[in-house]
Amino acid sequence: IGLAEAGADIVCVGRSDDSETQEKIKALGREYLNIRMSVSEENAPEEIVKQTVERFGKLDILVNAAGITRRVMAIDIDRKDWQDVLDVNLTALFFMCQAAARQFIKQGGGGKIINIGSMTSYQGGIKVIPYTASKAAVRNITMHMCNEWAAKYNIHVNCIAPGYMVTNMTAPMRSEPSRMAETNTRIPMERWGVPEDLAGAAIFLASDASDYVNGFTIAVDGGFLAKS
């Protein structure tokens, strides 16, 4: 929504109901395209870029926000749960970056890629080992792609690391009042973030204001990492 408020037309990829998001974006006077598929499907990145360019004529910004987790202790995780998380959070994310970068190169003029990492990009967690592994890797490959694409193609690849956020994914944690209270003591701002808190960082990284920022991860965490 924040990018639409800043003037961007939006392409949303996923299988969940997006009617509320679509209404908000159209109310802002921006165009909206929904592509009903999972980013982890084979050939999805190429198809997503193709449909985007067919509709809007070009691609300027990629935000990799898809993510899943499995809440299992490390001693109990099985290969399927491990691989399911890595397929969406890391493998699909990289190939979306690759497909977008190829389109940026074809267009000329560069482009902006924003990957969504996590505070677990910096530290371990509990019961989320494949998620932690994937998000640490996202931070690392963000730097790697910057190294290869910055000067040669003028492609900016940066990352946002959210802290504790009120989302569907964190609902199990938030259902435990004692866990919520304990977590708030570890956040200097003493509250969980909401998705709207990420808008400023996303707009900055998508805009010309960040033209000399590349390969970096911005924490939007209420100060959590500062206190850790």
Regions picked out by a protein language model, each given a short descriptive name:
Residues 1-11:
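Canonical Rossmann dinucleotide-binding motif of NAD(H)/NADP(H)-dependent dehydrogenases/reductases
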Residues 73-74, 78-86, 179, 183:
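Substrate-binding pocket helix/loop in short-chain dehydrogenase/reductase
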Residues 118:
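Residue(s) in the substrate-gating loop at a strand-loop-helix junction
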Residues 151-156, 213-215:
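Short, small/polar-rich loop/turn modules that mediate ligand/substrate recognition or access, typified
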Residues 123, 189, 202-203, 214-228:
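Short C-terminal tail/terminal secondary-structure segment
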Residues 102, 147-151, 211:
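Alpha-helical segment proximal to the catalytic Tyr-Lys
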Residues 97, 134:
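Active-site helix of classical SDR
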